Amino acid sequence: MGRIAVIGAGMGAMAAAARLAVAGHRVTVYERTRTYGGGVRRFERDGFAFDTGPGLLPLPAVYRDLFVKTGREPLEDRVELVQVDPSARHVFADGTEA
């Protein structure tokens, strides 16, 4: 099989790299930052942690499929999925909500 370079280590790139590796390719992932995950990051300041990426997993079936097809244990064995309803709430300065 071929040698493949994946540029970036965001969620989509890592999923592609995993699928390519399972298919038998030699995959190297290149990321310019010190961590992987793309927009899924966390930073700490003054003792508080801030998540900078998505807090929701809108299509869990896609991730379940990725775990199955890359030979991992089921997604739910690694991550606790909790139904969120509503997924967002917008409160304005005057107290009204949308």
Residue ranges and their predicted role:
Residues G2-A98:
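N-terminal glycine-rich phosphate/pyrophosphate-binding loop and immediately adjacent elements
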